[in-house]
UniProtKB/Swiss-Prot annotation:
GO molecular function terms attached to this record: iron ion binding; magnesium-protoporphyrin IX monomethyl ester (oxidative) cyclase activity
Region (Disordered): 1-20
Key words of the record: Chlorophyll biosynthesis, Iron, Metal-binding, NADP, Oxidoreductase, Photosynthesis
Name by which UniProt lists this protein: Magnesium-protoporphyrin IX monomethyl ester [oxidative] cyclase
Biological or metabolic pathway of the protein: Porphyrin-containing compound metabolism; chlorophyll biosynthesis (light-independent)
Family: Belongs to the AcsF family.
Function: Catalyzes the formation of the isocyclic ring in chlorophyll biosynthesis. Mediates the cyclase reaction, which results in the formation of divinylprotochlorophyllide (Pchlide) characteristic of all chlorophylls from magnesium-protoporphyrin IX 13-monomethyl ester (MgPMME).
HAMAP family: AcsF
EC number(s) on file: 1.14.13.81
Enzyme class: oxidoreductase
Gene responsible for this protein: acsF
Naturally occurring in which organism (per UniProt): Prochlorococcus marinus (strain MIT 9301)
GO biological process: light-independent chlorophyll biosynthetic process; photosynthesis
Pfam families attached to this UniProt entry: Rubrerythrin
Length: 390
């Protein structure tokens, strides 16, 4: 989980008056998936709950919530240069993340609407919410004389492929962790109004309910997983070439059989929980630490609260969750943060590329070791963890 920069292949600016943020492995990603598998999903196991959630989406509770008021007038000018830079960076990352969700949900709703209309409608409603969030954030950026070119982002961002099952895990956690992040900030600023640096935060209470409903949708979708796929593709891709044969259907069925074994689900649950928690912790205690300080928040306390709550929430749908109360859990995450700081110092320090690489290797290996030990940490069985959920 280092913060080493991945060189961008396109140097064109993505907003007016501001160079694009450097892309790192901690940056928001744009995703694509197997649309054929998605359109063939069998929802019958949990269709009633999915229909109820879709009805909630139709009501669009926040239709009139994201309306700017007079508090925004002149608010940008009140920020000192350092806080301004931190806040604009927050806006850019948040807007990119919300827009990434919009693109994925919109494309899913369009590609599966003929064969899976209920699923398509749910994705369309979520795309509406994500677009609204991204637009509201982008409007706040315009208060600082900046604006993300979302059309440019759509055309020029690299897209990462995730199979549907991985999309479910990752997006469920993203939405639920988003809920806890937003509500924690809102409640903190409600008690400490002097730390509210911008009126955008007044909208976080209702905003986080969109995130929560999206997470509930993926919860319901994952509960329909025992018989997810009706008919599987007769295609297989090898080395960039696609081949078609009826026998390939059995290959896919065997692959999905393996993926649906109880042990497999437990391993994937641990993987995605750790990936999301470690990424957030490394980012927030590293490059985002000063931003949370500007809100009067201690980044470590804030992240540990969010991780603990998200872990509890995940126990409702994942078979196992992380043992976040084990004393080594946060100790190892802190070690990763410490390693990342050293890696950053090496990157910005003196020395040639070869010597820097040799100095970085031990820290990369240490990060890998910490993550492996965290993954191998005995998980908690969700059925035993459920009573702690409120």
């Amino acid at each position: 989980m280092s913060q080493s920069t991945i060189e961008s292949t396109n140097k064109k600016e993505i907003n007016k008056g501001k160079a694009p943020a450097k892309e790192t492995i901690l940056s928001p990603r744009f995703y694509t998936t197997d649309f054929e598998a998605m359109e063939n999903m069998d929802l019958s196991i949990n269709e009633e709950e999915l229909e109820a959630i879709c009805e909630e989406f139709r009501k669009d509770y926040n239709r009139h919530h994201f309306v700017r008021n007079s508090e925004f007038e002149g608010a940008a000018e009140k920020l000192d240069p350092e806080t301004r830079e931190l806040f604009v960076d927050f806006l850019e990352g948040s807007c990119t993340s919300e827009f990434s969700g919009f693109l994925l949900y919109k494309e899913l709703s369009k590609r599966i609407k003929d064969k899976n209309p209920l699923l398509a409608e749910c994705f369309a409603h979520m795309a509406r919410d994500e677009a609204r969030h991204a637009g509201f954030l982008n409007k706040s950026m315009s208060d600082f004389g900046l604006q993300l070119d979302l059309g440019f982002l759509t055309a020029n961002k690299d897209y990462t492929y995730f199979p549907p099952r991985s999309i479910f895990y990752a997006t469920y956690l993203s939405e639920k962790i988003g809920y806890w992040r937003y509500i924690a900030i809102y409640r903190h600023l409600e008690k400490n109004p002097n730390s509210k640096i911008f009126p955008l935060f007044n909208y976080f209470e209702n905003w986080c309910q969109d995130e929560n409903r999206h997470g509930d949708f993926f919860d319901a979708l994952m509960k329909a997983q025992p018989r997810t796929v009706k008919s599987l593709s007769q295609k297989i891709t090898i080395g960039g070439s696609t081949f078609t044969h009826p026998l390939f259907d059995y290959f896919h069925r065997f692959r999905y059989f393996l993926n649906n074994l109880p042990l497999t689900s437990k391993l994937w649950s641990r993987f995605f929980l750790l990936a999301v928690f470690a990424t957030m912790y490394a980012r927030d205690l590293g490059i985002k630490k000063d931003f949370y300080s500007s809100l009067g928040l201690d980044a470590r306390d804030y992240d540990q609260f969010v991780i603990n709550k998200t872990n509890e929430t995940a126990a409702r749908v994942f078979p196992v969750v992380m043992d976040v109360n084990n004393k080594s859990f946060y100790g190892r995450l802190d070690k990763i943060v410490e390693n990342n700081k050293i890696l950053s110092d090496i990157a910005s320090g003196t020395g040639n590329k070869v010597s820097k690489t040799f100095r970085k290797v031990p820290k990369y290996l240490s990060n890998g070791y910490q993550l492996l030990r965290l993954y191998l940490l005995k998980p908690l069985d969700s059925k035993d963890y459920q009573p702690s959920i409120r």
